[in-house]
Amino acid sequence: MSDHPPEVMVNGRAYRWPAAPTVVICLDGSEPGYIETAIDKGLAPHLARLMREGANFAALSVIPSFTNPNNLSIVTGRPPSVHGVAGNYFLDPATGEEVMMNDARFLRADTIMKGFADAGARVAVVTDKDKLRALLGKGHDF
């Protein structure tokens, strides 16, 4: 008997519980040809194995095609009009200042990772972009 649900609902969508541990790698702003060339030259053997033995997809981006809206659409399963992060920055009309949208208060939708964590999955979020740390980790204890 399984100790987890067969699927998890997040933002109105059902996600099946993975049959095996799952890793999602998002290479933001990377032209697929760069990865293919690195693999062909033997410079990325681990990526070659992941692509050969796992699954890989060239993602379709959302508009606007900036880091924050796209990454958050991937992890929420919803467009910027729903998750609330429509750019990397916005202009604050009260101050006339540009505000970086890197604070979790701007995110209006739960992440798929949070949905699975709430259902009992062990979840980790790793990013080298400080601006994404709070957004991707919203609702987690790390």
What feature does the model see in each segment?
Residues 2-21, 29-142:
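Active-site nucleophile/metal-coordination loop of metallo-enzymes that catalyze phosphate/sulfate
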